[in-house]
Regions:
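Conserved nucleotide-cofactor-binding alpha/beta core module
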Residues: 97-197
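Sec-dependent signal peptide recognition
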Residues: 2-9
Length: 197
């Protein structure tokens, strides 16, 4: 009986140590990503760099691609969609020039990664995704990871989210030929930073 009581805590300690080592490994990968891919390309906002280090990108991609999570490029997330390259996520976030009290609209939730990054920097994030399976998965994951100020919904992002206007900023992760007037009308003030994805 005493041996069983000893073995269970011992196995639990082994599991905890393994999880801690794994998380430390992910943190190192994120540090390298920020230093070599993001800072070197000119992203300077210390808050954006901090959040890019802290947001667990590996949780937002399919498990079989997990080891490539912090690589310098987009990755497939299913349904013919991708998670954006880390540098692009950081750049789009920096271009919003966030102060912390903003309400941001994201067009194209994908796996939820960009919304998670924004969540730590703004008051509220509203994210629309046209692919139902993706938005459903992203909503579950964002909630599980504790991103409570992100609201997601399924729909046509180019129509925006009229019930929640005006927005301080809008990130469009898909590249339309032209910016829909319906989105422009939902901004508090209009300023464009077109960036190739």
């Amino acid at each position: 009986m005493h041996q069983i009581k000893f073995v269970i805590p011992f196995l639990f300690c082994l599991f905890c140590a393994e999880e801690k080592t794994k998380e430390e490994w992910w943190h190192k990968k994120a540090d390298v990503m920020v230093e070599k891919q993001i800072e070197r390309r000119g992203v300077k906002d210390p808050q954006v760099l901090k959040v890019m280090r802290e947001t667990p990108r590996h949780r937002f991609i399919p498990p079989h691609l997990e080891k490539m999570a912090y690589n310098d490029g987009p990755l497939p997330i299913g349904e013919g969609q991708t998670i954006s390259q880390p540098y692009i996520v950081a750049l789009m976030t920096e271009l919003l020039e966030l102060k912390g009290d903003e309400k941001i609209l994201e067009i194209g939730t994908g796996s939820g990664y960009q919304a998670a990054v924004l969540s730590a920097l703004v008051s509220e994030v509203f994210s629309i995704e046209i692919v139902k399976n993706l938005v459903d998965s992203a909503a579950v994951l964002l909630d599980k990871l504790g991103y409570k100020n992100v609201t997601t919904r399924w729909g046509d992002g180019y129509k925006g989210w009229p019930d929640e206007t005006p927005f301080d900023g809008i990130i469009v992760t898909a590249a339309p030929d032209e910016i829909p007037q319906s989105l422009i009308d939902q901004l508090k003030t209009v300023e464009f930073h077109p960036e190739p994805l």
